[in-house]
């Protein structure tokens, strides 16, 4: 179920959700009447109204929703949402900004940092390893990275083996320490 105070937003959400209601998510009685406590998961995606976001999250915690995700727009906002009881706080604008910034240099196509010490990076094969098999390229020993999969030409991503031939233009997904993955993606 989706809940929003804005009629236009509610109308647009009907394409994605089976049941959408125009209501005030910051009113505990309304949330009870709508049966919010019957749901296993709630997502608070209130945009710029920090007070409404915190209040809606608090109400869902009070209704004992087992899993609550909440969107934060600042670090302080995120800290408050955690203290109020959100189980997971996400920063979509910040995270997407970081992700896009990583694709602006080198050969990085996509970047996903899972924590400060581990990232998945989609990148093209550098000239230094093109024409070699995964075993002879020694990416793990030289760069400390694991090659998760490869996409050759217009084909799908496939798991690699030591015999996988790395060709210029192929796309790799590598996993490892972010700094090392960025260095690998910056090779010529």
Language-model-detected regions and their locations in the chain:
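Cytosolic regulatory regions of ion transport systems
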Residues: 1-188
């Amino acid at each position: 179920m989706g809940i929003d105070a804005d009629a236009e937003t509610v109308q647009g959400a009907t394409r994605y959700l089976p049941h959408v209601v125009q209501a005030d998510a910051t009113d505990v009685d309304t949330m009870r009447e709508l049966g919010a406590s019957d749901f296993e998961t709630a997502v608070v995606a209130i945009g710029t109204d920090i007070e409404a976001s915190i209040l809606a999250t608090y109400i869902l915690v009070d209704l004992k929703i087992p899993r609550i995700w909440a969107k934060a727009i600042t670090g302080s906002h995120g800290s408050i949402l955690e203290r109020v009881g959100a189980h997971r706080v996400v920063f979509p604008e910040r995270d997407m900004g970081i992700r896009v910034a990583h694709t602006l240099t080198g050969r990085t196509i996509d970047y996903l940092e899972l924590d400060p010490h581990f990232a998945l990076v989609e990148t093209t094969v550098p000239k230094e390893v093109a024409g070699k098999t995964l075993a002879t390229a020694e990416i793990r020993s030289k760069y400390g990275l694991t090659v998760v999969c490869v996409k050759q030409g217009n084909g799908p991503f496939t798991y690699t083996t030591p015999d996988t031939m790395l060709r210029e233009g192929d796309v790799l997904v590598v996993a490892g320490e972010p700094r090392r993955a960025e260095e690998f993606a910056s090779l010529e």
